[in-house]
Regions:
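Charged catalytic and DNA/RNA-contacting regions of genome-maintenance
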Residues: 1-324, 333, 337-353, 357-449, ...
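Active-site phosphate-binding and catalytic loops of NTP-dependent enzymes
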Residues: 86, 109-118, 244, 382-386, ...
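Intracellular alpha-helical coupling/juxtamembrane segments of multi-pass membrane proteins
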Residues: 315-318, 338, 342, 436, ...
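Extended active-site and interfacial segments that coordinate phosphate-rich ligands
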Residues: 37-56, 141-167, 480-511, 591-601, ...
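Amphipathic heptad-repeat alpha-helical coiled-coil/stalk segments that mediate oligomerization
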Residues: 198-204, 260-264, 276, 367-442, ...
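Conserved catalytic alpha/beta cores of large enzymes that bind or transform nucleotide phosphates
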Residues: 167-173, 502-535, 638-641, 645
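ATPase nucleotide-binding head domains, primarily ABC-like/P-loop NTPase cores
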Residues: 34-37, 223, 293-294, 301-304, ...
Length: 865
């Protein structure tokens, strides 16, 4: 037995896409067969059936309706699969023999463009990595917006760049080599043909796509590694997307020294775009400052937060724009309101390129462009360079707006093949077809009235459906009155359906006019879509200007609402913050509850702050706020402080907290040391370093020794000499002030009253003389006997001059003496517990039965003491 022709067609197409699940169009369904069917039925919870395929056994099969296929594709992509969409390339009704089919697109995690499958304010990047020995080139694009970037990072920083960009999919010329360089954490990694990465082939692909004769126009003639990555990525897109990608109009070379590289630990510890609890909005810096009105602006602001600037002049230009809107809040708020009417123009251009833009998308584009004249008018008197450039780059595209206004029906349906999308008056021919339909339908109504009168059949009706066309329906009770000229067409349970030659003739005219109308509408709409495609460049430039304007209004609004100030960019490398605040933490407190703090770090005698004090006192919050203030300034934002003069930091490093890395088998201490080593290898004197509790993952003396050595290494100008905030429980490190140049002691101010301790959250000069750790344990709810015992051991250690190895012996030597006292303490604790319970009883509210039960329980507790 042989496979059926259709199954042979299926397997032939599937063989060309062996790494994909093939969705094979059959009528109104997409079907999957054989192993693909088994996989899809398991992952999508679909019923697995079978289909005759010409063999003895039926082929495993499952399918999904064409109108809901995107829901299923999204689930498969989320689970890591690639999906090939195989469509019918001709009308099955007109096909002679087997319907021609072909793959029209391959959808992968990095090539998703459907807005329902994407987050509005998050880019969906595909990345291509080219490795050549000790050199690397990377390219990344968001196919849904047309953004395209290339870079040649140092091989040692490749992993950090991948972590910064966070691509959903990575392709490369050597997957094994990439894993050896950056580890196993690369999402959606796959190797691609080496030929794509060869320089000659890559340059040909680039020149062909951008319609160039030479590479100099792209600025990549001396950047061969980036060119190889960019060309290979374009080849991958052309192979999978099956279209010309005309919305990808340019590429930008990302200079290594233009923006700050934030490693994964810093982004996580500072909770820039995701909180430590995994929340993407609440508790993050981005969630606080994102008051953008458009999806485009939201994506741009996210990229600014993840890529702080390193050029003081560029930072100042952004700050000028923000300041202009802070000073004119009416302008800022009005711009925000205008921008709310702007749709995601970047992703609309993707729809133009993919030729799946519908009439409602056209209306969205038209509505967005109509906002431009008003926005330009609002910017008429702006003075800052950035705002002036934005005004100049805004193009209202009045000709295109006028076309869309005249052509598109405001109530157009989503589907473009069913008519109703072109406005009346746009096409005289189309209006004639519509008039023919309208007059024909009126003729049908008149005929219905005439036939009722002629036959005496009161409930005679003329109706229409897609299968039988127009027909006369008569119920069985009136069949005796049906005239001979009626031609029976269909018999139903309670009625008969008939046709007349006259009705048939009019039906053909109406349906003919309707078909011609739909066909002409589709043709007209296609022409309109092509007119939009011709203006992609102008639309994208306008979108770029709008999203930047949106970010500026968002930053100005955040600054105004939270009393932020414009930071000064210091030229001497000093860092001075007066009454600085943590931007996120203060939002969770009532106005005035957050305690602000000053900070002074410079390149001389105040390079490093050794900060001592107990947990829960505010050390970590303080250090993070300093880092966040510096980062906010470098994205062009005002900062939460009374005054701030800040240097441009080339890197911000943080090592805060640690836990076991179970996936890689690393202990807490190993993770801590790896992170510390990374900082010591990469920090420079222009960096800002935040270190919290170095050395706590090992023994006391080992930890102290490591922490001491790290402080010495960072403080040494010949080695690093960076501005550093170093929090520690090792009070011995306070001795370094006066012995190491640039080191100063600070602590958290504490107020003691008897056994009670109040943390004042204020950073003051000097070292802490107590840790208050046992007090923190009591606040955390540790049982009273443990607290009592901890105080005893603490007192013993404080008066003993012993080394670490003899601590245990010293404590245990007292065990027999203290055991009796410990029992007395336990008795006192139990007695106090009973007294406390009695005091908490509400005598006026308790019922007699509850009182007896409570008395019984208290008696039992007293008996057990």
């Amino acid at each position: 037995m042989a496979l059926s022709p259709m199954m042979q067609q299926y397997l032939r197409i599937h063989d060309a896409y062996p790494d994909c699940l093939l969705l094979f169009r059959l009528g109104d369904f997409y079907e999957l067969f054989f192993e693909d069917a088994k996989t899809a039925s398991r992952e999508l919870e679909l019923t697995l059936t079978g289909k005759d395929c010409g063999l003895e056994e039926r082929a495993p099969m499952c399918g999904v309706p064409f109108h809901s296929v995107n829901t299923y594709i999204e689930k498969l992509i989320e689970k890591g699969y690639k999906v090939a969409i195989c469509e019918q390339m001709e009308d099955p009704a007109l096909a002679k023999g087997l319907v021609e089919r072909d793959v029209v697109r391959v959808i992968t995690a990095g090539t998703v463009t459907d807005p329902t499958m994407l987050e509005d304010k998050v880019n969906n990047f595909l990345m291509c990595v080219f490795l050549d020995g000790k050199h690397a080139g990377i390219a990344w694009t968001d196919v849904s917006t047309g953004e395209f970037y290339v870079m040649e990072p140092e091989i040692s920083l490749l992993g950090a760049q991948i972590a910064r960009i966070q691509p959903m999919e990575v392709i490369c010329n050597d997957a094994a080599a990439l894993i050896s360089v950056v580890g196993n954490g690369v999402r959606g990694l796959s190797g691609q043909p080496q030929a794509w990465f060869q320089r000659k082939n890559a340059e040909e692909t680039l020149c062909s796509h951008f319609r160039l004769t030479q590479m100099t126009s792209l600025g990549l003639e001396d950047r061969k590694y980036a060119a190889c990555a960019a060309g290979a990525m374009l080849k991958y897109l052309l192979e999978t997307q099956k279209n010309s990608l005309e919305h990808i109009r340019s590429l930008r070379f990302a200079e290594n020294g233009r923006t700050m590289l934030l490693d994964q630990n810093t982004r996580r510890n500072l909770e820039l775009t995701e909180s430590l609890r995994g929340d993407r909005k609440k508790g993050t810096l981005l969630g606080l400052i994102d008051k953008t009105s458009t999806a485009m602006g939201g994506r741009l602001l996210r990229s600014w937060v993840e890529q702080p600037l390193l050029d003081p002049e560029e930072i100042s230009r952004r700050l000028d724009a923000v300041e202009e809107l802070v000073k004119d809040r009416v302008l800022g708020m009005t711009l925000s309101e205008e921008l709310e009417g702007v749709y995601d123009m970047e992703r609309l251009m993707n729809k133009v390129a993919y030729r799946n833009m519908n009439a409602r998308d056209c209306l969205a584009l038209c509505a967005s462009l109509k906002r431009i004249p008003g926005i330009r008018g609002l910017l008429l008197n702006v003075q800052s360079g950035e705002m002036t450039r934005i005004r100049e780059e805004l193009d209202p595209l009045e000709e295109l707006t006028g076309l869309l206004d005249r052509a598109i029906n405001p109530d157009a349906p989503v589907v473009i093949t069913e008519g109703g999308i072109i406005r009346e008056g746009y096409s005289a021919v189309l209006d004639e077809y519509r008039e023919a339909q309208t007059s024909g339908k009126q003729w049908i109504l008149d005929l219905e009235s005439r036939e009722r009168e002629a036959t005496g059949i009161r409930n005679l009706r003329i109706q229409y459906n897609k299968v039988f066309g127009y027909y006369i329906e008569v119920t069985r009770s009136f069949l005796g009155q049906v005239p001979d000229r009626y031609i029976r067409k269909q018999t139903l349970t309670n009625a008969e359906r008939f046709m007349t030659p006259e009705l048939k003739e009019v039906e053909q005219k109406i349906i003919g006019a309707q078909e011609q109308s739909v066909r002409l509408e589709l043709q007209l709409f296609t022409e309109i879509r092509e007119r939009i495609a011709e203006r992609i460049d102008s639309i994208q430039r306008t979108a770029q200007a709008l999203k930047k304007l949106d970010v500026f209004q968002s930053l100005s609004r955040t600054a105004s609402e939270n009393r932020y100030v414009r930071p000064l960019i210091s030229t001497d490398g000093s860092l001075s913050i007066t009454e600085g605040r943590h931007p996120v933490v203060e939002q969770n407190l009532k106005d005035g509850e957050f305690i602000p703090n000053d900070t002074l770090l410079d390149c001389g005698e105040n390079r490093m702050m050794i900060i001592t004090g107990p947990n829960m006192a505010g050390k970590s919050t303080y250090m993070r706020q300093v880092a966040l203030i510096c980062l906010m300034a470098q994205i062009g934002s005002f900062v939460p402080a009374k005054e701030a003069s800040l240097p441009v930091c080339d890197r911000i490093f943080t090592r805060v907290g640690a836990s076991d890395d179970l996936a890689s088998g690393q202990s807490t201490f190993m993770v801590e040391m790896s992170e510390t080593a990374h900082i010591l290898r990469n920090a420079t004197r222009n960096s800002l370093i935040i270190l919290d509790e170095i050395g706590r993952g090992t023994s006391t003396f080992d930890g102290l020794s490591i922490a001491w050595a790290v402080v010495e290494y960072i403080a040494d100008r010949e080695k690093i000499g960076a501005k550093t905030l170093f929090a520690t429980h090792y009070h011995e490190l306070s001795e370094l002030e006066g012995h190491l140049e640039g080191v100063k002691n600070y602590c958290i101010s504490v107020k003691e009253h008897g056994e009670d301790v109040l943390f004042l959250r204020k950073i003051i000069r000097g070292g802490a003389d107590k840790s208050f750790g046992v007090h923190v344990a009591r606040l955390a709810g540790v049982p009273h006997p443990v607290i009592v015992r901890a105080h005893e051991i603490q007192a013993r250690l404080e008066v003993s001059d012993i080394n670490q190895n003899k601590i245990g012996q010293n404590i245990l030597g007292e065990e027999s003496v203290n055991r009796k006292n410990e029992q007395v303490d336990l008795f006192e604790y139990k007695k106090d517990e009973i007294i406390q319970e009695i005091q908490q009883i509400d005598v006026m509210a308790i019922t007699p039965m509850d009182a007896m039960n409570k008395l019984f329980l208290l008696k039992e507790k007293a008996r057990k003491i």
